[in-house]
Curated annotation (Swiss-Prot):
<keyword id="KW-0597">Phosphoprotein</keyword>
<keyword id="KW-0656">Proto-oncogene</keyword>
<protein>
    <recommendedName>
        <fullName>Proto-oncogene FRAT1</fullName>
    </recommendedName>
</protein>
<feature type="modified residue" description="Phosphoserine">
    <location>
        <position position="243"/>
    </location>
</feature>
<feature type="region of interest" description="Disordered">
    <location>
        <begin position="132"/>
        <end position="194"/>
    </location>
</feature>
<feature type="region of interest" description="Disordered">
    <location>
        <begin position="232"/>
        <end position="274"/>
    </location>
</feature>
<dbReference type="GO" id="GO:0060070">
    <property type="term" value="P:canonical Wnt signaling pathway"/>
</dbReference>
<dbReference type="GO" id="GO:0005737">
    <property type="term" value="C:cytoplasm"/>
</dbReference>
<comment type="similarity">
    <text>Belongs to the GSK-3-binding protein family.</text>
</comment>
<keyword id="KW-0879">Wnt signaling pathway</keyword>
<dbReference type="Pfam" id="PF05350">
    <property type="entry name" value="GSK-3_bind"/>
</dbReference>
<keyword id="KW-0963">Cytoplasm</keyword>
<dbReference type="GO" id="GO:0000578">
    <property type="term" value="P:embryonic axis specification"/>
</dbReference>
<feature type="compositionally biased region" description="Acidic residues">
    <location>
        <begin position="7"/>
        <end position="23"/>
    </location>
</feature>
<feature type="region of interest" description="Disordered">
    <location>
        <begin position="1"/>
        <end position="24"/>
    </location>
</feature>
<comment type="function">
    <text>Positively regulates the Wnt signaling pathway by stabilizing beta-catenin through the association with GSK-3. May play a role in tumor progression and collaborate with PIM1 and MYC in lymphomagenesis.</text>
</comment>
<feature type="region of interest" description="Involved in GSK-3 binding">
    <location>
        <begin position="191"/>
        <end position="214"/>
    </location>
</feature>
């Protein structure tokens, strides 16, 4: 029937209009703003309305535990004579907390100073652990209260943790063995200079190896040199006196040399004496 369809459509439109009206906040009377005190009172009223609407329509947060109710807005403080704006105070009710306290270690949501009204100042749900026993598991290495710091016997690992630990231990043991046997392989691989150079570059001991070889070569050269009496330190050279029969002594002291020499005549030849 066309009449019934029209009535049903009108009823559906009215229901949708009522739902739309419920989703908006309408002011029943106009307010004339005369000063900062009126503005603060209007803000407090809007906050109360939004808080009640949010608590009535929206379900509780998934991370919220059955704990204290949302904080209630106290009456606004009256402005003083100088005209400074009044501030609103937020305080959770103590009777609800004492009657139904949250269990120790429970996680609850902290939405900031505006209670459950989520704005730019508190847009996220911050998890807070209530005082009491910690919700986290106790560390296996500590025994007793956290403040004592007593060590307990470590429990053996099981499953994939044990396999990963054994794999890491075996890898570290192989690495230590490789580092310990590195000097032996170095002495055996002296015949291959390219491989030795590659190992030194990868290990970062190229400069140390060069200094060690230079020092050992210098020691070998000092060991091969013969012990000469005239060799001495460069800072204090040794000057030996010239021998009496050397031409250097004759040039330095010709009178003494001629006095020491004795001439012998024989076969018309001059022979210097000894």
């Amino acid at each position: 029937m066309p009449c019934r369809r029209e009535e049903e459509e009108e009823a559906g439109d009215e229901a949708e209009g009522e739902e739309d009206d419920d989703s908006f906040l309408l002011l029943q009377q106009s307010v004339t703003l005369g000063g900062s005190t009126d503005v603060d009172q209007l803000i407090v009223q809007i906050g109360e309305t939004l808080q009640l609407d949010a608590a009535h329509d929206r379900p509780a947060s998934p991370c919220a535990a059955p704990g204290p109710p949302p904080p209630q807005v106290l009456a606004a403080l009256p402005a003083d004579k100088t005209g400074t704006p009044a501030r609103r105070l937020l305080r959770p009710t103590g009777s609800a907390e004492t009657g139904n306290p949250a269990p120790p270690g429970a996680v609850r949501c902290v939405l900031g100073e505006r209670g459950r009204v989520r704005g730019r100042s508190a847009p996220y749900c911050v998890a807070e652990i209530s005082p009491g026993a910690s919700a986290l598991p106790q560390q296996p290495g500590l025994d007793g209260p956290p403040g004592t710091g007593k060590l307990s016997t470590p429990q053996p690992l099981s499953g994939p943790c044990r396999r990963g630990w054994l794999r890491n231990a075996a890898a570290s043991r192989r690495l230590q063995q490789r580092r310990g046997s590195q000097p032996e392989t170095r002495t055996g691989d002296d015949d291959d200079p390219h491989r030795l150079l590659q190992q030194l570059v990868l290990s970062g001991n190229l400069i140390k190896e060069a200094v060690r070889r230079l020092h050992s070569r210098q020691l070998q050269l000092h060991a091969k040199l013969p012990a000469h009496p005239f060799l001495g330190p460069l800072s204090a050279p040794v000057h030996e006196p010239p021998s009496p029969g050397s031409p250097r002594a004759a040039c330095s002291d010709p009178g003494a040399f001629m006095g020491r020499a004795q001439l012998r005549t024989g076969d018309d030849l001059l022979v210097p004496g000894s």
